[in-house]
Amino acid sequence: KAPEFQGEVVLVTGAASGIGKACVESFLARGCAVIGIDLDNSITSTSSGSNYLGLVCDITNENKFKEVLETGVRYFGGIDMVVLNAGIFPGGKKVSELPTDEWRKVFSVNLDANLVLLREIYPLLQLAPNKGRAVIIGSKNVSAPGPGAAAYSASKAALNQLMRVLAMEWGSDGIRLNTLHPNAVFDTAIWTDEVLTSRAKHYGLSVNEYKTNNVLGVEVSSKDVAELAAEMCGSLFAKTTAAQVPVDGGNDRVI
């Protein structure tokens, strides 16, 4: 039996580390060709083999993104799927102390760049033989925001609304868009040992207790999120669009 995504191409943003890198691995394992883009130069060596192309790109630079998109399409011949994972989470500042420039920077990465990406990739998804698919990496903060995360929470909520609108606008093309809402994925760049220790102490927990502080008592990894992202592009979810699926072990505020 041929791999599920053999002959198909996925574009993954923020693909040099964390959830994005795990997505590269999950899609490659299913026979997919992968275009990985990231601001980090290590993206060019995130994976090896003829089915992977890593390209350095600041997704907030519209012209650079268009150039990179064209490079990827010329290399593999098209794009069937996209995983929107790139995002930033500065955090820590209450709204009363939040600089306008920081607010705008978070929105430029988490929302505006994704609008451009989706708009530019739309004609390619329309041509996908098995219909185009998009998975948006959202956040628990969409339904359960936290103090000190105004820009992040608001930008992810706006991105989620964009997904819902596009699910309606692109449904007639057979294009499916769905969002995954992870929480506390600790093997990503933002969770340094220092941050982990600090947050655990804030809640009066050990680091291990903090990592599994959810209804199921499990730790959620980048691979967990990536595997579901890949599955949502597959036949199992062929009749699902505009869904929002938590990947958080069960967060009591979300539930």
Predicted regions: what is each one?
Residues 139:
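Residue(s) in the substrate-gating loop at a strand-loop-helix junction
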Residues 118, 155, 163:
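Active-site helix of classical SDR
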Residues 218-247, 252-253:
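C-terminal substrate-recognition "lid" of short-chain dehydrogenase/reductases
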Residues 123, 168-169, 238:
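Alpha-helical segment proximal to the catalytic Tyr-Lys
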Residues 171, 176, 240-242:
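Short, small/polar-rich loop/turn modules that mediate ligand/substrate recognition or access, typified
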Residues 16-17:
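Conserved glycine-rich cofactor-binding loop
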Residues 66, 89-104, 148-151, 190:
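Conserved mid-core segment of classical short-chain dehydrogenase/reductases
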Residues 96-116, 135, 159:
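Catalytic Tyr-X3-Lys loop
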